[in-house]
Amino acid sequence: MYQRNILVEQTDPEVWAAIQAEDRRQEEHIELIASENYASPAVMAAQGSQLTNKYAEGYPGKRYYGGCENVDVIEQLAIDRIKQLFGAEAANVQPNSGSQANQAVLMAFLKPGDTILGMSLAEGGHLTHGMPLNMSGKWFNVVSYGLNDKEEIDYDALEAKAREHKPKLIIAGASAYALRIDFERFAKIAKEVGAIFWVDIAHYAGLVVAGEYPNPVPFADVVTSTTHKSLRGPRGGIILMKAEHEKAINSAIFPGLQGGPLEHVIAAKAVAFKEALSPEFKQYQQQVTKNAKVFAETLIQRGLRIVSGRTESHVMLVDLRAKGITGKEAEAALGKAHITINKNAIPNDPEKPMVTSGIRVGTPAITTRGFKEEETRLTANLVADVLDNPHDEANLEAVRAKVHALTSRFPVYR
């Protein structure tokens, strides 16, 4: 028998100390990694509930185990809410991650050796879209599209490659592309060559919900996403699809890839989806894009080059070559100043993937903690200050003090 008042700090002081240290890091550091955000206390409470104890192989109303009547209610709520958010015909909320959601799409529609057409990882795509070391690159014949000389998706070249290679599946979506994607044009190309059209909106999902980024659901056969990042939920994945594909996708998730779903995480997803249906969430996403625009403009004013020259979303790539430092060096220097960011390859990057010539910046997390244009401009200037003198310890100390002054005014959790 367990007593409900027994806490981690009593039973495992070592783990508790690390949790507390991470809590301090999140509160005291400015988070600019585009794929990170802060889940609400309600989302975290749902994920930490007794639902973690329940096995529930199958789907609502069709379970292998008994005693699933309560998790059925929760999972159906999550399904109904995510369908409402995106206007989707059908949805699966069981994927444990975005990568597993993507694997399910490949399993549902393809056989090993089939041809897929996805965005090159070197020009902004994601590793699950055909990177050679990923399952998607090992099992399938991969053809890649990329950017034109304006660093925008080259739709003409994409169309030509689709006609030449006749892929069975075409992928839209990226992990490091700041501009809007023309999903309607993608859909027309896919229809012309008889391909399944799949969109991965892991980065853009929250913006889509709020109307700040185009919604691919009316055009795509299937759409995948993570549930953290801009959706601000727990770590996990979802799949949206046309009703005709529901059976194939559901079978690919279970029993194809997963066994018992994580119902405590699905409960947290349901809570996050309800939050995303609120007017406040739309206002939040509007501020995310405002902050991103201000951040990019400020960095440009400070002499830095933004890939594509602008952002039309929450994210931007910064070319560091003019500063004479690598992305790896910038990440380390900014980390010392308590600004968390990630190194990132830029198009046609001459550096190795673990070094890079750029960094990726995103505004979802700083917007969650309450930053508006003024605080965002200040943050961008602090980033530029570090990049101007990345090896000057006095400079890093001065920036760190300003970071702490700012984060103390805008706590993540009060």
Swiss-Prot record:
It comes from the Bacteria. GO terms for cellular component: cytosol. The keyword Mitochondrion does not apply. GO terms for biological process: glycine biosynthetic process from serine; tetrahydrofolate interconversion. The record marks H228 as: Plays an important role in substrate specificity. InterPro entries: PyrdxlP-dep_Trfase (IPR015424), PyrdxlP-dep_Trfase_major (IPR015421), PyrdxlP-dep_Trfase_small (IPR015422), Ser_HO-MeTrfase (IPR001085), Ser_HO-MeTrfase-like (IPR049943), Ser_HO-MeTrfase_PLP_BS (IPR019798), SHMT-like_dom (IPR039429). Its EC number is 2.1.2.1. Pfam families: SHMT. It catalyses: (6R)-5,10-methylene-5,6,7,8-tetrahydrofolate + glycine + H2O = (6S)-5,6,7,8-tetrahydrofolate + L-serine. Catalyzes the reversible interconversion of serine and glycine with tetrahydrofolate (THF) serving as the one-carbon carrier. This reaction serves as the major source of one-carbon groups required for the biosynthesis of purines, thymidylate, methionine, and other important biomolecules. Also exhibits THF-independent aldolase activity toward beta-hydroxyamino acids, producing glycine and aldehydes, via a retro-aldol mechanism. This is Serine hydroxymethyltransferase. The gene is glyA.
